Each structure stands twice: as structure tokens, then as C-alpha cells.
Amino acid sequence: MNWPAIERVESKRVVLDPLTVQHAPEMLPVLADPSIYEFIGGTPPTLEQLHRLYGVQSLGHSDDNAQWWLNWVVCLRRPRRAVGYMQATVERRAGVLEANIAWVISPAFQGRGLATEATASMIVWLTASGVDRYVAYIHPDHAASAAIARKQGLRPTSVVEDGEVRWQNE
């Protein structure tokens, strides 16, 4: 499938900038807080790891073109500052475009509704790009992410993968 190019997405307080390798230095301090990894696993990345990861993620699609990879850096509008990231992996399933979405906001900026605003903006853009179904995998103890998903119209299902509950909009 020929996927459209990722675009910049703007909302009232945040801008979603399409991810590039050049974002790595700016994202390093955003991802440095170990508490980010409490529910998602892993450890804070090094600059070299971010360069490699962003090199792959910014390609925009899988080698076989079956998946559309969308990654944005979430930035405050004023002052312009990176505070997190948004992700969507889109693929066709049973004739429907399904986006597996995820979000991370630096703990220093959590509790302000930024993830909710950024996620809503991403979903509007994805819907305009033809996506029909949204799913997110959320740790059952991660109340903040569950609240964000619920505000986007996602509901928990009985499906559990790797200890995370599948949420979806249908």
C-alpha cells in the first residue's frame, strides 16, 4: 500500500512534529526520567540508541509496506519545547485501517491534559487519513493512560497481550 506522508499536526497548546533523527538530542532529556518506564518497560535510552531508533521509525513504513509508521514529537507551542511523543502503527485488518496508538509525556509535564490534547489531535488527523479503528495496549494499573484512552472513546476489551489490556473504539 502507498501510505500518505506524515504531516505536522497542531492543536491549541501543542504541535506534533513528524519525528526525524534530528530530534534525538532534544528528546534525550524528555525520555531520561526512569518513571516513564514503570508500565511500558525498558530504561532511558542513550543518544546513540535514539539515533538508531529514530532512523528506523522515521522511514514511515515497514519493509513490506504492510504497516504505516507514524511518529511525532509532542512540543509545547510556547515556549517551543519537546515534552513527549505520539505513535501510531497503521495496518489493514479485515478491510479496515486500524491504528495501534501510544503516547508518552515527560513526567514534568504530566497532569496538564497535554497527552489528551495531543492524542485527540492525532486521532483527528488519522481519521482524515482514512483510519477507522483505534486500539491501545495499556497496563491495567496505568490509570492516567486509561483515562486518556477513555476520553478518546476507547473502551477496554477482554484481550490481554504481554500484561496489557487492549482498548479500542469499537
Report residues per predicted region.
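GNAT-family acyltransferases
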Residues: 1-108, 121, 125, 129, ...
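Internal amphipathic alpha-helical segments of the cytochrome P450 catalytic fold
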Residues: 37, 111, 145-146
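Conserved G/P- and acidic residue-centered "switch" motifs that form tight phosphate/ATP-binding loops
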Residues: 80, 113, 142
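Primarily hydrophobic membrane-targeting regions of prokaryotic envelope proteins
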Residues: 111-114, 119
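Conserved active-site alpha-helix within GNAT-family acetyltransferase domains
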Residues: 116, 141-157
